[in-house]
Amino acid sequence: MTNTQINDKILELANYLKIDNKCVAHNARLQSIQINGAVIKNFSFKLFNEYKLSFFNCKFLCEINEAPGFFEIENPVYIYGCTFEENVISYNIKFKSNVVIAYCRFNKNFYFKANTFCNSSNFERNFYNYASFKKSHFEKNVTFYNST
């Protein structure tokens, strides 16, 4: 991928997330895009199909509600130190790579229903409200750290 193509993808992603593109960095060695310290006003887990994305210390102001309709996510999901101000609801997603959601704060509901996790997953966080993994299927290790 050329620098122009990378810059175009970063701008496209920043526009979709409704963030300042200065919060977005590309790591060519890891072939990934990192979003650092952004205030995010639009989001979908489907983004992980197109990019290897990592979110660090971001604030999500939007509800994340992946409506019923099965889809697969090929790339890893990495979300560290983020705050979710609205509900995070996920239905029928098959996560085919690692899922790491670490040291995040969920100020409303965190609800995963009928998802499949095909690889090792780490959920290191505190729950301040309601959390449910109803009918979710984990094919490999799942670790909860410091959960209350």
PLM regions with names:
Residues M1-T148:
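N-terminal leader/targeting and pre-domain segments
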